[in-house]
Amino acid sequence: MRLGFIGLGAVVETAYLPALRQIFDTPLHCVGFDLRPERELPGVVRSPSLEQLLASPIDTLFVTTSSLHHLDALELALSSTIPRIVVEKPVVATLSQIERLKTLLAKPEAAARVLALDHWMARSGAMQLALGILNPAWQPEWENQTAGRVVNSLDEIVKIEGFLQEPSGFNAAGEPVALNFATGEPDTRQLRHPDGVIIDIGTHVLAMMRETVRALGGNHALSLQVITATDRLGRPIATGDLLTAEGEAHLQGHVSGIPVDIWLNKYAGPAGGQKGLRLHLCDGRIISHDRCGTEDVLELIDGENVQRWTLPGAIYAHCLAEHILGEKSLYERAPGEVAFTTQRRLEEVELLLKLQQQLRGPH
């Protein structure tokens, strides 16, 4: 298996390469290119130019540049013969880029090659528990712990909450600072718009939520509004502010007609907070899918009675193994779904970008 990367930044170093080492026993053939000549990663052979990378015999190409350059890289990649092109989230970064991307994907032969990736779309535990098809990889808290089908129809779900509340640290002035999601070290980047929580991490929650609802029989209907949005110091984002990144936001709306609340926070304190979904059922029970340390945690909550399962491993490793690479990949098991999956990710990014316009004003 031959893999290529356009962009050799932090997400490749801290997420992709560790995940590939976890999945495969033997090293893969990886090649890559980055505009910054000093960027070299162990295990990735650097190509002298992007043209040479795209001419290489690559099975799957990952577009892992900064989000503003995803579309330019994708356009060049589509001119190559590489059969599978996976674009990191968000698939594009501006509303004007969305129109260009839609034009590219209007060609069926191009749409069949391009998969817009959000690794949270692999977090399907809540759906599995709801349908009574929990993967044996989920480890029960108690021996002989079982749960049959929990949800028989979509109208049994009365509300969904989505969360991504990341742990944070403090700088010398006592102000909150973001932490790298993979290493836990302080994030030295100066986060600016559009890299606030609405686009940067809202994409994760929305992808997980929509894939779950879709698998339970939902449709593509989607609407959201911004209830609150503040910077890392808790100050409201002002109309006309095109510089300050949102540090925290509350979004509210409907997915397939179900009321939803999405809680996003990049500065949730040293312990962080919830990272996943809570499905509230009409009989009072709750299906909770969370993340704790290096494990996903699934719970069926019925008052004081809680059944719990855990799934160890990095989310990226599960996503690459179950959706992107090998015989289980979406390209292999359901090639017709590749374009539809990309369309859903594009719809989500477009809506979130429009929320930014409403929050800050046209830009």
Report each predicted region and the residues it spans:
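A contiguous active-site-proximal alpha/beta segment in oxidoreductase catalytic domains
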Residues: 92-176
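Local beta-strand N-terminus motif with an aromatic residue
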Residues: 29, 58-61, 157
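Beta-loop-alpha module in the N-terminal Rossmann-like domain of NAD(P)-dependent dehydrogenases
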Residues: 42-107, 123-133
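C-terminal helix-rich "cap/oligomerization" subdomain common to oxidoreductases
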Residues: 32, 60-62, 110, 217, ...
